[in-house]
Amino acid sequence: MSRAAPFTVLIPARLASTRLPNKPLADIAGLPMVVHVARRASQSGAQRCVVAADDARIVQACQAHGVQALLTRADHASGSDRLAEACELLGLAGEDIVVNVQGDEPLIDPRLIDAVAALLHARGDASMGTAAHAIDSAEDFANPNVVKVVLDAQGLAHYFSRAPIPHARDHAPGSLWWQPGQTGVPVGFAPLRHIGIYSYRAGFLRRFPQLPAAPTEQLEALEQLRALWHGHRIAVHVTGSAPGAGVDTPADLERVRTLLGG
């Protein structure tokens, strides 16, 4: 992607976390985790990187380290709602591109951010962009915490699911049909793992929270299914590099601290 193609990175950060309280402020090598995320994101081609926080303590921690941050309402139901408010606060135009980088991804690859932003610069018919990576184990294919995505020939998402999709009709019901090295698989097929990074047009992001929730979204607990349900297209970048580990638990935090020297 040309680094001249403009976009803004927004990083939602919420202080409350069931499994890891005060997660955005967790210390990693002497810096709050959300600052690590912002610094990684700033290595992309983004014009600016902004943290959208629900608590003044996050804003203060970011500003102390030179990271732009906004205080948003604390009662937002989702990160998308928080980002929609941030778009308003920043005065972004409807066609401006926004990339949503999660605040618990201190190992995010800046090149992935660029690639997901580039999807919307290249695809005027898409309202959203995201990323995926080939699944390389039967365990991940079966794991409901590993979200799968199926694409069409144009690289647009057909569907996202926690189930192992697609399913091979002739395989025994109730058993896993795919594993690495599986024979009889159509040429070019590989199951894909969804990576939780998104690009949006700011106008769509403002409207998204007002769209009625989709039945599929409610069943799968996957917010992106709302966009598909209402007829919006999601372009998908398939990366050859496995994504960096996110931080959801104390064990994840210790692993990242080891990797980043803290």
Curated annotation (Swiss-Prot):
Annotated keywords: Cytoplasm, Lipopolysaccharide biosynthesis, Nucleotidyltransferase, Transferase
One Gene Ontology term, aspect cellular component: cytosol
UniProt key word Glycoprotein: no
Pathway involvement of the protein, from the record: Nucleotide-sugar biosynthesis; CMP-3-deoxy-D-manno-octulosonate biosynthesis; CMP-3-deoxy-D-manno-octulosonate from 3-deoxy-D-manno-octulosonate and CTP: step 1/1; Bacterial outer membrane biogenesis; lipopolysaccharide biosynthesis
Keyword tRNA processing listed: no
InterPro entries: Cytidylyl_trans, KdsB, Nucleotide-diphossugar_trans
Localization per record: Cytoplasm
NCBIfam families linked to this entry: kdsB, PRK05450.1-5, PRK13368.1
Role this protein plays: Activates KDO (a required 8-carbon sugar) for incorporation into bacterial lipopolysaccharide in Gram-negative bacteria.
Name listed for the protein in its UniProt record: 3-deoxy-manno-octulosonate cytidylyltransferase
Source organism of the structure: Acidovorax sp. (strain JS42)
Gene coding for it: kdsB
